[in-house]
């Protein structure tokens, strides 16, 4: 019996897989299913958007009609259509779609935070008066001090008289206009 040299396996043709770039990455079946389910949820989020928001998301020619059809369908047909949309999304680069969707969600969250800040500022204006007016004038130098004082005085009277808070709403609207004109 002849003994083979120990390096005889190194001479096998086609065995040049020493590059890390050529390495095969194995993905489990469960991970593939999780990714497919996540894309189906992404498709459902897109389907739940309104027409104006849908226009802001980059969708190609055959994906958009599928989404519009899913918006019109109810019950079991909708589920099947969402499956189809998920399948279509698997064949595409979904990163631009995700970014546009995140941008839409973030814009809504920023607006909610801004409204809470304006409501707190309105309440401080009613409670503190001139100190809070100085804060508003620092934030928005073009704000009308006299109009703010009038609205604050009326809001205090309405609060004391247990009347509907018409002036408080007007203060909020005025602050919102100032914030929108700024940005």
UniProtKB/Swiss-Prot annotation:
Molecular-function GO term, any one: rRNA binding
Transmembrane segments: none
Gene3D superfamilies: PSPTO4464-like domains
Compartments reported by the entry: Cytoplasm
GO CC terms: cytosol
UniProt keyword terms in alphabetical order: Cytoplasm, Ribosome biogenesis, RNA-binding, rRNA-binding
Main location: cytoplasm
GO BP terms: assembly of large subunit precursor of preribosome
Record has Disulfide bond as a keyword: no
Similarity remark: Belongs to the DarP family.
Function of the molecule: Member of a network of 50S ribosomal subunit biogenesis factors which assembles along the 30S-50S interface, preventing incorrect 23S rRNA structures from forming. Promotes peptidyl transferase center (PTC) maturation.
Name listed for the protein in its UniProt record: Dual-action ribosomal maturation protein DarP
Organism: Shigella flexneri serotype 5b (strain 8401)
């Amino acid at each position: 019996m002849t003994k083979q040299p120990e390096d005889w396996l190194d001479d096998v043709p086609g065995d040049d897989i020493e590059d890390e770039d050529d390495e095969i990455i194995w993905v489990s079946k469960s991970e593939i299913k999780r990714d497919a389910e996540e894309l189906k949820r992404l498709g459902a989020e897109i389907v739940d958007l309104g027409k104006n928001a849908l226009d802001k998301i980059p969708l190609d020619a055959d994906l958009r009609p599928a989404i519009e059809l899913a918006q019109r369908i109810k019950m079991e047909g909708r589920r099947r259509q969402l499956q189809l949309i998920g399948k279509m999304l698997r064949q595409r680069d979904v990163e631009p779609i995700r970014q546009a969707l995140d941008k839409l969600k973030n814009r809504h969250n920023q607006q909610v935070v801004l409204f809470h800040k304006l409501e707190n500022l309105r309440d401080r204006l009613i409670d503190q008066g001139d100190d809070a007016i100085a804060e508003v004038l620092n934030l928005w130098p073009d704000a009308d001090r006299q109009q703010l004082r009038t609205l604050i005085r009326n809001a205090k009277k309405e609060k004391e008289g247990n009347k509907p808070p018409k002036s408080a709403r007007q203060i909020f609207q005025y602050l919102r206009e100032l914030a929108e004109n700024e940005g």
